[in-house]
């Protein structure tokens, strides 16, 4: 199962679409500036931000090194709270289990809170095939669902839209008001409330699951997570297998880092933890709770040179500083995980066949690594991906392989190298104008200057200087 957005289009075409979308680029640029500045201000309030990053990295590394222990502890405590736990190796297994739960309830209306992993496994499409109406309750995700538009950002999925675009979408679905944000928000609240009240099943993601208690933690700004977990009689939470913490102590640290890194807030409006089924005497909460823990090739990443990518807490700080994302937007990546984290993660989860271009969609400036609150060496992992693509997978472009082999032969022979230096000015003349190569290599010359080789070589120049 592919988790791509538009894999029927080549990356070069998606990239071009993004670059040529002036409105999207302006929206992304403004959002990046706002989110980046907010993160820096919020981080400064903590004092020694680097110490917090070090501690957060230690927490995530410790969990990954002892993941089997904490997942077992989590599953035991969920069961003690009356919940059911299902370990899904593949997206198909996860979707099949969730469909069976919904089928057993004869449910037709499902409401969801924001969840990257459910998008990763294609859950909405699987449930719609079952005949269910699935409603996203996160405002940004709901807007995109109405517009049949994929998300472009991990934290702010509708980042590429402004209020006029939202107004146009709402109007197409019966809205008659203005484009005032308050009025738009009121309409969304009224419509979503109807879905909350008639939903038979609620589905959530999981920011962090707490092993010592069996609780699931949700971080939201809209309160939709609490509605999804308190109103339906059946609640299903879906989590990537790495999204577990030992205790509330570590949960507190990572939530603090998540909120400040994602949106520049000390805390989001709602930090929700819930565990198991409704207890005797409680008036809300589910009568039935299921926790689906998804592998989807994560276990293949453990113990490899890419293991540190599983430290990710999905804050999107790397995306908010990435110059490539700034120019091409999220849709160009063809994955629900865009930006630097997507360029590292997508090939691991869905194969180099689909995403071998993404590791090259980077300037390797290292801004992503500096911004990451859990210190994932993202730019180093991108370089490692490139090495794997070229040396192990042998998937570099054919022309590039031939060119590199030819250069290796030429550069290792003084005679051939000197001959090439003298031939190059004449060989490139048909493609050059005023000393600049302008044809034949569009991937380079469309965005960079490429001077024509000089007729006087360095060796010739040196000989003349030496005789002077």
Curated annotation (Swiss-Prot):
One GO BP: lactate metabolic process
Gene3D superfamilies given in the database record: Alpha-helical ferredoxin, NagB/RpiA/CoA transferase-like
InterPro entries: 4Fe4S_Fe-S-bd, 4Fe4S_Fe_S_CS, FTHF_cligase-like_sf, Helical_ferredxn, LUD_dom, LutB, LutB/LldF, LutB_C
PROSITE patterns: 4FE4S_FER_1
Residues at which [4Fe-4S] cluster 1 binds: 312, 315, 318, 372
Single Gene Ontology MF annotation: 4 iron, 4 sulfur cluster binding
Keyword vocabulary terms for this entry: 4Fe-4S, Electron transport, Iron, Iron-sulfur, Metal-binding, Repeat, Transport
Region of interest: Disordered: 442-468
Family the entry assigns: Belongs to the LutB/YkgF family.
Descriptive protein name: Lactate utilization protein B
Taxonomic path: Bacteria, Bacillati, Bacillota, Bacilli, Bacillales
Gene name of the record: lutB
């Amino acid at each position: 199962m592919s988790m791509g957005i538009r894999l029927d289009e080549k990356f070069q075409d998606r990239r071009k679409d993004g670059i040529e979308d002036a409105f999207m680029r302006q929206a992304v640029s403004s959002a990046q500036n706002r989110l980046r500045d907010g993160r820096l201000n919020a981080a400064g309030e903590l004092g020694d931000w680097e110490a917090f990053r070090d501690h957060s990295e230690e927490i995530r590394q410790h969990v990954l090194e002892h993941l089997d222990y904490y997942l077992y502890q989590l599953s035991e405590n969920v069961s003690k709270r009356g919940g059911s736990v299902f370990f899904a190796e593949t997206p198909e297994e996860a979707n099949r289990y969730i469909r069976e739960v919904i089928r057993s309830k004869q449910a037709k209306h499902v409401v969801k809170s924001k969840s990257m992993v459910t998008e990763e496994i294609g859950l909405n499409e699987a449930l719609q095939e079952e005949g269910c109406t699935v409603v996203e309750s996160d405002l940004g995700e709901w807007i995109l669902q109405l517009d049949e538009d994929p998300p472009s950002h991990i934290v702010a999925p509708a980042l590429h839209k402004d209020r006029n675009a939202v107004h146009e979408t709402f109007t197409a679905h019966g809205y008659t008001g203005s484009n005032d944000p308050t009025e738009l928000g009121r309409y969304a609240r009224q419509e979503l409330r109807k879905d909350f009240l008639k939903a038979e099943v609620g589905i959530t993601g999981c920011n962090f699951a707490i092993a010592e208690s069996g609780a699931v933690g949700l971080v939201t700004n809209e309160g939709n997570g609490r509605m999804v977990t308190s109103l339906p009689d059946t609640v299903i939470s879906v989590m990537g297998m790495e999204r577990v913490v030992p205790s509330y102590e570590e949960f507190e640290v990572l939530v603090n880092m998540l909120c400040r890194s994602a949106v520049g807030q000390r805390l989001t409006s709602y930090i929700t933890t819930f565990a198991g089924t409704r207890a005797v005497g409680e008036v809300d909460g589910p009568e039935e709770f299921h926790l689906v823990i998804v592998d989807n090739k994560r276990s293949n990443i453990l113990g490899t040179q890419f293991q540190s990518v599983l430290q990710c807490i999905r804050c999107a700080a790397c995306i908010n500083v990435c110059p490539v994302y700034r120019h091409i937007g999220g849709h160009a990546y063809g994955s629900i995980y865009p930006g630097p984290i997507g360029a590292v993660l997508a090939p691991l989860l869905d194969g180099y066949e689909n995403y071998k271009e993404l590791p090259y969609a980077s300037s390797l400036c290292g801004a992503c690594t500096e911004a990451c609150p859990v210190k994932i060496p993202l730019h180093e992992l991108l370089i490692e991906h490139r090495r794997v693509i070229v040396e192990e997978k042998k998937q570099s472009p054919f022309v590039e392989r031939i060119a590199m082999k030819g250069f290796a032969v030429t550069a290792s022979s003084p005679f051939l190298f000197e001959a090439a230096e003298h031939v190059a000015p004449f060989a490139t003349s048909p493609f050059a104008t005023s000393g600049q190569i302008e044809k034949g290599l569009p991937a380079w010359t469309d965005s960079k200057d490429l001077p024509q080789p000089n007729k006087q070589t360095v060796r010739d120049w040196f000989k003349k200087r030496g005789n002077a």
